[in-house]
Amino acid sequence: MANAYKQAGVDIEAGYEAVSRMKKHVQTTMRKEVLGGLGGFGGMFDLSKFALEEPVLVSGTDGVGTKLMLAFMADKHDTIGIDAVAMCVNDIVVQGAEPLFFLDYIACGKAEPSKIENIVKGISEGCRQAGCALIGGETAEMPGMYSTEEYDLAGFTVGIVDKKKIVTGEKIEAGHVLIGLASSGIHSNGYSLVRKVLLEDGELSLDRIYGRLELPLGEELLKPTKIYVKPILELLKKHEVYGMAHITGGGFIENIPRMLPEGIGAEIELGSWQVQPIFSLLQEVGKLEEKEMFNIFNMGIGMVVAVKEEEAKDIVRLLEEQGEKAHIIGHTVQGSGVTFIEGTEV
């Protein structure tokens, strides 16, 4: 049977075209340590230049979750790749690791070259922001598994850190200051609830601007996850950081305790940073309690670092010089978990 594979739903020629179109984007992420080119059976990365006493590789993997469904609805695919990279590199930089390279996995119902190119364009942008190379990936056309408009996106990153410089959180003590780095919005967690509250129950339109939003709802919801790698690595060069938390699924309540040693809790001062309007809209339309919001969403803070009190203001200044919006949002205390206290509105 001629073109049997194509008749089964797999278009090999479209796959070749997609690879050809993505190469120019991938090339912009290259580092001098990358060996070989795109299309080999494996990606290679030379570690010999890293003059570390005890080099440790740190890896992280993640996906974008149901935020992808917003990309399908809006037919916008050029930024969702940034989210895939961000979710991985932010997870390893909190341990002090410099991301070295990234590999992606795209599974789709139909390999449309222009759509695949746009996805990889976003992945490449995320890699540039993180300073890591996109050294490989896989695009799997899976008719029958996904509809022709659907795809899933995941990836993983590998980074490196000297063993003595790993940030573990084990030295955090009561009285350390917590600094929050602003998020760009919802990032990549909680989108099943977002869709239910705003689109299904609230019947809001992706094309309209609501409340204090500055963008149409669809654009607001598709804002890419902020990548904190470069400012955090710069911070680690100049100050001691005792612990870091990437505020992802589970919000403040689940993620901040992940960096804290036993017997230490966190006290967060409400009002010490600006909560973006999208969270207020979600809470209002969904009639969600504040505690539930903090247990699901980042609430405007995408990364939290624990530092000594006497260095806190200098660190905020350094982060702001790196282009970050940084705020002192609380401190560590004897105890456990996360508690919230009322503060002064910023």
Swiss-Prot record:
SUPFAM superfamilies, alphabetized: PurM C-terminal domain-like (SSF56042), PurM N-terminal domain-like (SSF55326)
Top-rank taxon, per record: Bacteria
InterPro entries: PurM-like_C_dom, PurM-like_C_sf, PurM-like_N, PurM-like_N_sf, PurM_cligase
Cellular location(s): Cytoplasm
Coiled-coil boundaries: none
UniProt-listed Pfam families: AIRS, AIRS_C
Keyword Aminoacyl-tRNA synthetase carried by entry: no
Alphabetically ordered keywords of this record: ATP-binding, Cytoplasm, Ligase, Nucleotide-binding, Purine biosynthesis
Gene Ontology CC terms, in alphabetical order: cytosol
CDD domains noted in UniProt: PurM (cd02196)
Gene3D superfamilies linked: PurM-like C-terminal domain, PurM-like, N-terminal domain
Enzyme Commission (EC) number: 6.3.3.1
Record pathway: Purine metabolism; IMP biosynthesis via de novo pathway; 5-amino-1-(5-phospho-D-ribosyl)imidazole from N(2)-formyl-N(1)-(5-phospho-D-ribosyl)glycinamide: step 2/2
BP GO annotations: 'de novo' IMP biosynthetic process; adenine biosynthetic process
Reaction(s) catalysed (UniProt annotation): 2-formamido-N(1)-(5-O-phospho-beta-D-ribosyl)acetamidine + ATP = 5-amino-1-(5-phospho-beta-D-ribosyl)imidazole + ADP + phosphate + H(+)
One of the record's GO molecular function terms: ATP binding
HAMAP family, alphabetized: AIRS
Family, similarity comment: Belongs to the AIR synthase family.
Name of the protein in its database record: Phosphoribosylformylglycinamidine cyclo-ligase
